[in-house]
Amino acid sequence: MMDSSPEKTNLELLYEQVCEQGREFEVVFYPMLPRLYEMMLPSLEARLNFLSVGYRHVAFSRYVHGDVDCVHREVMAQKMVLLTSILSKLLNVNGILEHQEYLNTE
């Protein structure tokens, strides 16, 4: 029988109930990427990074190619302005740009 003392959380009570039944549960994580990527991205860290970059690319594509009001829109706009500004300064320092209007930092 479960001990319903007020000190225990619902999760702890559920855990006790499951353990009393004596059953073992197997947790399986199915791959989200095709098998080809297992060769290209051998480590779990590389695969997670690949997925993260993919999600950022999707957010960027939505920002650039459509008037989508998503959570990332403002962040992307700020990062694009910052990146453009940094590139402009680097190119000016190296004397590559003769005219500032090539990169609009506004």
Curated annotation (Swiss-Prot):
CC per GO annotation: host cell nucleus
Keyword Transferase among record annotations: no
GO process annotations (BP): viral DNA genome packaging
Signal sequence residues: none
UniProt keywords, alphabetically: Host nucleus, Viral genome packaging, Viral release from host cell
Quaternary state and interactors: Associates with TRM1 and TRM3 to form the tripartite terminase complex.
Family designation: Belongs to the herpesviridae TRM2 protein family.
Protein name: Tripartite terminase subunit 2
Organism, as annotated: Human herpesvirus 6B (strain Z29)
